[in-house]
């Protein structure tokens, strides 16, 4: 009887040990799985196009990062780029969870991955989307503007055979819009004809940013160039004409920062111009929870953000920089849906 009792006691001890080990393993397994499945401790990466990646835009990027961090409780990392495609692919792949893209860049990103969705964009002066646009411009050096005169105004009639600078093949206002205008104006088959040296233009170059394209023109490397207003006008003074109209003349400021420090005092004249839908901030919705998306959108479209001078800059202040010009007290970020970009 004593042998049986001893065996029972040994079996009981063994079962207790197994159960205890199972409990430990279960707890460890749950803990491990919980850590792997949680991404709330990871930083949110926000990618910016080359035009907003320059050193003088750092305060603007930091202001956006701070708002997102306060809204989500997560750290934020800023990703700057020197290539439009890199920014688009970062958002498409999920390497970046948010991005500030041009309208064309957003459409391309959404076509590659429908989980990339626009969230909010800058409003018009009335705080609405009714006239929420900026401008794509085709410009020439003012000293050569007479070559493009058409009566008492200017036109793009004589750009054929000239050297031309675009921003990037994925830029909305630096390629898609101006190339569409040129194709339509000259009855070309497609914009592909604009990309090869000697086909339509004598030579074609890319600035890789709106600033770079403008410098290509002002330095004399290109006879004509496409670039927008919102990414470069803080470096210029309006010399004559109405802002963003054909015939308007702009001059690089005497104290303009790089890359315009090499072309200070140079002037350009607008010979073609087209309005463009404002650029959106976008989410990769696979990488941010719905609650996080809502929290960020609410924070970025708030009155506090609209009053943040690091993001919404005063156009009357020659030294001010930011992502969006504060056209009025009503200028702010407003929520936007994918369908708003259908015209692109």
PLM feature spans:
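C-terminal motif of bacterial Sec signal peptides marking the signal peptidase cleavage site
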Residues: 25-29
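Bacterial signal peptide processing site
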Residues: 31-33
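Short, well-ordered beta-strand elements
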Residues: 38-53, 74-80, 162-165
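An extracytoplasmic/periplasmic, membrane-proximal ligand-sensing/linker region
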Residues: 41-44, 48, 52-63, 287-344
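Beta->alpha turn/N-cap motifs
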Residues: 48-50, 82-84, 95-107, 111-115, ...
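A bilobed periplasmic-binding-protein/Venus flytrap-type ligand-binding module shared by bacterial periplasmic
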Residues: 50, 133-149, 272-290
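A conserved helix-loop-strand patch within extracytoplasmic ligand-binding domains
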Residues: 122-186
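Pocket-lining segment of extracytoplasmic ligand-binding domains
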Residues: 171-289
């Amino acid at each position: 009887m004593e042998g049986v009792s001893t065996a029972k006691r040994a079996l009981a001890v063994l079962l207790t040990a197994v159960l205890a080990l199972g409990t430990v393993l279960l707890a460890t397994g749950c803990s491990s799985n919980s850590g792997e499945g949680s991404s709330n401790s990871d930083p949110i990466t926000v990618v910016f196009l080359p035009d907003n990646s320059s050193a003088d835009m750092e305060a603007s990027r930091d202001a956006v990062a701070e708002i997102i961090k306060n809204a989500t409780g997560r750290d934020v990392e800023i990703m700057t780029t020197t290539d439009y495609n890199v920014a688009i692919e970062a958002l498409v792949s999920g390497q970046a969870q948010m991005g500030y893209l041009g309208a064309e860049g957003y459409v391309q990103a959404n076509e590659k991955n429908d989980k990339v969705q626009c969230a909010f964009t800058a409003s018009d002066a009335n705080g609405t989307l009714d006239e929420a646009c900026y401008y794509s411009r085709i410009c020439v050096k003012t000293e050569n503007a007479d070559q493009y005169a058409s009566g008492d105004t200017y036109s793009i009639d004589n750009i054929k055979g000239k050297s031309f600078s675009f921003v990037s093949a994925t830029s909305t206002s630096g390629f898609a819009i101006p190339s569409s205008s040129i194709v339509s104006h000259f009855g070309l088959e497609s914009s592909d004809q604009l990309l090869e040296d000697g086909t339509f233009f004598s030579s074609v170059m890319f600035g890789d940013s709106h600033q770079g394209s403008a410098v290509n023109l002002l330095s004399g490397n290109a006879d004509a160039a496409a670039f927008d207003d919102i990414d470069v006008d803080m470096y210029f003074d309006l010399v004559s004409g109405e802002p963003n109209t054909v015939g308007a003349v702009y001059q690089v400021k005497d104290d303009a920062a790089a890359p315009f420090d090499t072309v200070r005092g140079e002037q350009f004249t607008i010979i073609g111009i087209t309005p463009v839908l404002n650029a959106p901030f976008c989410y990769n919705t696979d990488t941010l929870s719905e609650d996080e998306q809502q929290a960020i959108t609410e924070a970025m479209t708030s009155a506090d953000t609209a009053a943040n001078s690091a993001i919404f800059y005063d156009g009357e202040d020659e030294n001010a920089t930011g992502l969006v010009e504060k056209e009025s007290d009503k200028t702010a970020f407003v929520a936007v849906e994918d369908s708003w970009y259908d015209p692109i």
